[in-house]
């Protein structure tokens, strides 16, 4: 089966949703109210103008009487514009002959398709017509992902040194501003209601998790549905072939386990949208290795350079190494990219140089993993916790500094960030002999509201005494608006005496403040990690 056929199968349900929404757009309004009465509501948002402009053009809406009704209107508006943007990008790709632009458009079509799905998921979750099926915290996660997707699309052009041609295509939709308005309004409801991120039923499961999925999450032992083996002793010789079979399931609510026997698998994996509940089990991170060599200098966007790209919900990987062997001279080269909500990586090794691990979006948990890299080697805009992990800066190019994290929060209301808890930061073997000659920092602000915390972690002398770095030397970008924090760390470089003195840097002294970034609170882990068979600590 060729790549295009696989993509067509993987995206079939997404295309059906988008076509349906395109057809139904004129029917989504009801004959009540008028645009002038909405101005007061729009004035409460961060971006009143695109809000008012949208409702002037779509004047058949029902005037909201409370903020929850206004939220539904905003999400409907954002979804309408996202569908329009996806349609424009798809049409543009039909006439595009430039190889680099084709690569950027392929990413953008996928990302905007996911944005539509996240907005639709939010709408179904918060609408009174369907009955509340999610918490405000869930909605904030999905809205955060929708906004992250638009930013990832925009940045693809700069990766390949082509002019930003995607922004003009979608500019009249004002989609990013409309999603930011959704985040602000939903965020207000989240704060006002003190909505607990772990809200669920009496057994701790989120209300949107079905009974079948609850049984699935409670399974302690698993049997492989398919076996992959290089020597031909399994069902397939490649991991992607097994993933493609899983993607053809009519029902994806049951866990699909793929056992990958020891071996080096030179391939690029894609677990696409709607290919949910995949579990990859290897023979250990030293024995089951998935490796690739794509890079930005090799003609790929950062997003598409990933050796493994994970999008389907509830993905689990256990005992596997993900490598990108492009090398430090090739620039951005991702080993693992996850956009999978409620995804788990246990006892995995993620190995690369620049941009090793793209924690792109959604809620993610990494336990007892090894992560190797040089520049910005943990980056993205997920809500992610690394617990009991070992983080290993490697030897970079001459003159380069190592930066462990580059968190990508673009909106103050996004509930995203990187939390490193009870972990170890030490030099990789290739850096150790020359560790004094290379500066290493725990993070720098990729975006305006970058958020990273390091909690109860051993910090070796590999880390510079100042701890953190500006985006570039002398830059003040994000230094007042970021949130970087440390809490009860240990080790030679754990002292905060010589740390940066930015407005956005904090030394936390109260457990109550630090606990906001625990597994239980930051990613609602107590609602979906129990019963997975993966150990975790919910509090600090």
From Swiss-Prot:
Keyword Methyltransferase: no
UniProt-annotated binding residues for substrate: 302, 332, 444, 446
Catalytic activity line of the entry: [(1->4)-alpha-D-galacturonosyl methyl ester](n) + n H2O = [(1->4)-alpha-D-galacturonosyl](n) + n methanol + n H(+)
SUPFAM superfamilies referenced in this protein's UniProt entry, alphabetically: Pectin lyase-like (SSF51126), Plant invertase/pectin methylesterase inhibitor (SSF101148)
Active site location: 355, 376
Protein name, as recorded: Probable pectinesterase/pectinesterase inhibitor 60
Gene: PME60
Tissue expr: Expressed in siliques.
Catalytic class of the enzyme: hydrolase
Signal found in the keyword field: yes
Highest taxon of source: Eukaryota
Annotated region (Pectinesterase 60), positions in chain: 225-526
């Amino acid at each position: 089966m060729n790549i295009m056929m696989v993509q067509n199968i993987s995206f079939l349900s997404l295309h059906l949703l988008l076509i349906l929404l395109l057809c139904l757009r004129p029917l989504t309004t009801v004959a009540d109210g008028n645009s002038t009465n909405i101005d007061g509501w729009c004035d409460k948002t961060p971006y009143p103008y695109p809000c008012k402009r949208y409702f002037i053009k779509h004047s058949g809406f029902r005037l909201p009487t409370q903020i929850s009704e206004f939220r539904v209107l905003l999400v409907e508006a954002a979804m309408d514009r996202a569908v329009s943007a996806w349609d424009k990008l798809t049409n543009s790709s039909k006439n595009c002959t430039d190889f680099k632009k084709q690569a950027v458009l392929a990413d953008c079509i996928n990302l905007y398709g996911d944005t539509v799905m996240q907005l639709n998921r939010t709408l179904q979750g918060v609408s009174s017509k369907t009955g509340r099926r999610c918490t405000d915290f869930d909605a904030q996660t999905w809205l955060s992902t929708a906004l992250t997707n638009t930013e990832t699309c925009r940045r693809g052009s700069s990766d390949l040194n082509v002019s930003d041609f995607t922004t003009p295509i979608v500019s009249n939709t004002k989609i990013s501003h409309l999603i930011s308005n959704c985040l602000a309004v939903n965020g207000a409801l989240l704060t006002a209601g003190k909505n607990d991120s772990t809200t669920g039923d009496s057994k701790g499961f989120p209300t949107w998790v079905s009974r079948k999925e609850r049984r699935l999450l409670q399974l302690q032992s698993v049997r492989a549905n398919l076996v992959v083996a290089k020597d031909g002793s399994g069902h397939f010789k490649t991991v992607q072939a097994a993933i493609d079979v899983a993607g053809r399931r009519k029902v994806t609510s049951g866990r699909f386990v793929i056992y990958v026997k020891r071996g080096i698998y030179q391939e690029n994996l894609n677990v696409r949208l709607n290919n949910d509940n995949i579990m990859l089990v290897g023979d250990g991170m030293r024995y089951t290795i998935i490796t690739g060599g794509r890079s930005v200098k090799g003609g790929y966007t950062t997003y598409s350079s990933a050796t493994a790209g994970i999008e389907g919900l509830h993905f689990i990987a256990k005992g596997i190494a993900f490598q990108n062997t492009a090398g430090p001279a090739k620039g951005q080269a991702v080993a693992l990219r996850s956009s999978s909500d409620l995804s788990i990586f246990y006892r995995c090794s993620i190995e690369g140089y620049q941009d090793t691990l793209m924690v792109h979006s959604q809620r993610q948990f990494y336990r007892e993993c090894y992560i190797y890299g040089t520049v910005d080697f943990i980056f993205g805009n997920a809500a992610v916790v690394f617990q009991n992990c070992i983080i290993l800066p490697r030897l970079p190019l001459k003159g380069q500094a190592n930066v462990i994290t580059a968190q990508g929060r673009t909106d103050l209301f996004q509930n995203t960030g990187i939390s490193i808890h009870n972990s170890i930061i030490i030099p990789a073997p290739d850096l150790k002999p020359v560790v004094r000659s290379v500066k290493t920092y725990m993070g720098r602000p990729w975006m305006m509201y970058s958020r990273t915390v390091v909690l109860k972690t051993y910090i070796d002398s590999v880390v510079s005494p100042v701890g953190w770095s500006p985006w570039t030397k002398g830059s003040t970008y994000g230094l007042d608006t970021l949130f970087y924090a440390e809490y009860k760390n240990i080790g030679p470089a754990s002292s905060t005496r010589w740390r940066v003195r930015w407005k956005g840097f904090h030394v936390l002294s109260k457990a109550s403040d630090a606990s906001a970034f625990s597994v239980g609170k930051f990613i609602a882990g107590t609602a979906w990690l129990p019963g997975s068979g993966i150990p975790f600590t919910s509090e600090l």
